[in-house]
């Protein structure tokens, strides 16, 4: 079945746990000699108290830093895999991954079971849970400590 995954999507929050999912995503892409899309999303606070003129600059800085970190990942963890596309965008990770998976018609999404904030996961539900419920393709979930 992984040989059928010609287009693999993996989101990262730059934690070791997300790197485990990234390792599986790379394996799937290599098995199929397919494309690997690695994405990071800068989260936008939705509360009005955050409506501040500094946010656009902060998001630009965060996006620039994320692009640098993805480029470093491409070299260090993705072995410069030539069929890799690096994506940085602004928005809620689960929703943006679903949008990206739909737009790019990916065959599988690889994700870590929990993100950076376990408290938010507990209250709002994890990104993995949202992906499982709404993704347009299979979702491969890597639990903490596996990889």
Predicted features and spans:
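Structural beta-alpha unit
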Residues: 1-3, 75-109, 146-147
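Small/aliphatic-rich secondary-structure junction motif
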Residues: 2-53
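General small-molecule cofactor/ligand-binding pocket signal
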Residues: 37-39, 85-89, 140
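Short secondary-structure boundary segments
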Residues: 40, 112-114, 143-144
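Short, hinge-like loop/turn segments at secondary-structure boundaries
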Residues: 53-57, 103-104, 127-128
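A short acidic, glycine-rich active-site loop
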Residues: 55-68
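Glycine-rich, Arg-bearing micro-motifs that act as flexible, cationic patches
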Residues: 108-130
């Amino acid at each position: 079945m992984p040989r059928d995954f010609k287009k693999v999507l993996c989101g990262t929050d730059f934690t070791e746990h997300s790197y485990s999912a990234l390792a599986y995503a790379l394996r799937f892409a290599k098995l199929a000699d397919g494309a690997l899309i690695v994405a990071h999303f800068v989260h936008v606070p939705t509360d009005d108290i955050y409506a501040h003129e500094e946010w656009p600059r902060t998001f630009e800085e965060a996006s620039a830093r994320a692009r640098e970190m993805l480029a470093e990942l491409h070299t260090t963890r993705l072995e410069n895999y030539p069929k890799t596309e690096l994506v940085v965008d602004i928005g809620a990770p689960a929703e943006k991954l679903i949008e990206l998976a739909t737009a790019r018609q990916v065959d599988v999404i690889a994700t870590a079971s929990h993100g950076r904030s376990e408290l938010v996961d507990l209250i709002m539900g994890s990104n993995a849970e949202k992906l499982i419920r709404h993704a347009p393709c299979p979702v491969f979930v890597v639990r903490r400590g596996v990889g």
